[in-house]
Amino acid sequence: MKKKLLALLLGLTLCLSLAACGGSTDDTAADDTADTSGDDAAETVTLTVAASPTPHAVILEQCVPILAEQGIDLVINEYSDYVVPNTAVEDGDEDANYFQHIPYLEEFNETRGTHLVDVASVHIEPMGIYAGKTASLEELADGAVIAIPNDATNEGRALLLLEAQGLITLDDSSNLTATPNNIVDNPKNLEFQELEAATIPSVLADVDLAVINSNYALGAGLNPTTDALAIESSDSPYVNVLVVKEGNEDNEAVQALVEALHSDAIRDFITEEFDGAVVPAF
C-alpha cells in the first residue's frame, strides 16, 4: 500500500513539473512573437515630404503604395507657399520637398544661404496667361493691369511669357530673374501687380490678365491647356524637382522615392491625370 501511494505521489509530481515546463515554453514563444513584431515595426522607415497640394501631392500619393511595399511610410505634408517647404527641409523638419523648379531653388539657396539640392527631375508645369476682366490678348486695352508672381524667378518667368506674346520687350530675353524694371518697351503701358503666386487666382476678377503657375491654376479649377490664353512652350527650363538637404542625396528612402517618381506608372499617371497641364520630365 505504501509503495502504491509513493508511486502515485511521484506521478503527480512529474505531471506538475511537465505542466510548469509547458507553461514556460508558451510564455517564451509569446515573448519571441512580441520581439519579432517589434523588429518588424522598427524596420518601417518614415519619409516626410513637403509638397504643394496640386499636382505635387497628388503625384506623391501614387507613390505611397509603391514605397509601402518596401517598408517605407511616405508622409505627405501640404504647404501653400513657396518658402516654408524649403526652410523645413533645411532645418530638418521635413526630409524632402517637391514643389519648386530649378531656377527657384538656385535663387533660394543664393539669397537664403540654404544648402538644398535636387535629386530628381519630375515634371514641368507650363505657366499660363489667364483672362480676368479682359477676355483675350487682342482686346487688351492701354493701361491694362496684369497680375504676376512677386518671387524673383517666377516673376521673371511671367515677364518672359508676356514678352513671347509681344506685349512687352525686356532688355535681356535670357534673364530668368527679370523684373518690371527690365522692361524697355511697353507699348500698351501695361501695369503690373506683383503678388504672392498662390494668391493670384483669387484676384482674377480684379485684373485684366493674370500670369499663374499651373499648380495654382489647377488648384483654382483652371485647366492650363484649355483655359489659358497663352502657355509656355514645352522646352521650358522650369522643371519641378524633388529636393533634399545637401548630404542626404544617397538616403535609401529618398532614393526609393526617386525610383518611384521615375517609374512608368507615375509617368502614365501624370500624362493621363493632367492631360497636358503637367508634363513628365523623365
Predicted features by range, described:
Residues A42-T54, I72-E78, V145-I146:
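Short, well-ordered beta-strand elements
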Residues E107-V119, K133-T134, D206, V211, ...:
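Ligand-binding "clamshell"
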Residues P126-L137, V239-N251:
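A bilobed periplasmic-binding-protein/Venus flytrap-type ligand-binding module shared by bacterial periplasmic
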Residues N154-E163, L261-A281:
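Periplasmic-binding protein-like
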Residues K2-S24:
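Sec-dependent N-terminal signal peptides of Gram-positive bacterial secreted proteins and lipoproteins
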Residues V119-I168, R267:
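A conserved helix-loop-strand patch within extracytoplasmic ligand-binding domains
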Residues S17-A41:
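Bacterial lipoprotein signal-peptidase II cleavage site
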Residues I76-T87, N175-S202:
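Short helix-initiation/N-cap motifs at beta->coil->alpha
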